[in-house]
Amino acid sequence: MNLYGMLDAEKAMAGLLYGMNPKTIVSVPAQEEINFGKAVFLNESKTALVGGKYNNKATVDLSAYTTASKDIALTINSVTVTVTTSGTIATDVAALVSDINDDVDGVTATAGTGGNAGKIFLASDDSTNLDIELVYDGSDVTDSKVTTSSDCVYAGVAVFHQNAFLNSRGVYVPTETVNVMEKGYIWVVLASDVTPSVDSNAYVTAAGTFTTESSGNTLVGKFKSGKENGTGTEKLALVALD
């Protein structure tokens, strides 16, 4: 197949470098499986790569819940901790923090103090995503009482690596050194329903795919092709990272 020609019929390959343009490539170990042609992110400690800009921090605001005898259920990564309010928010927060630290693996909870009294601060121990739901007195209040954030930082795009097909694996595996393109031309994986035009801005989503949508995403370069077929149902485009 003609990977460097017009790809009207042929398939491109995710993570394949393109042409003789100047390139900047660095090497960083993988914390988890990393897919070719997707953006990668440095974890909170900046020591390894993860495959998404995960919401690894969260704040749960319970400060308004001072009425006694109301049920609070906080679910974190499918594990639920509960408390029936006592009328003293500090007591209820302390109980929830204790239960979270005992029962929810890989998550550390701390109680807010001073101006943050009545809040619970959550952190993923390994920079992975926090999936949180908060129910108060039978009502889902997640949207109004839970805020999430990410310490993960965009690093570049995972380069195709032939040796990673050992034992039929088509990814970088945990602890393997990942070749990461910071600057240059590379075939990338598109987000769903994205059809870029040449020289339109290329943005990275939190999932590591590429889009033309700016809202909530990271500008990393320009598209240099339209949508092309990858393997299976995967859709790709050529991007110039800058």
Where are these regions (language model features)?
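Extended, beta-strand-rich, solvent-exposed assembly scaffolds of outer structural proteins
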Residues: 59-136, 197-203
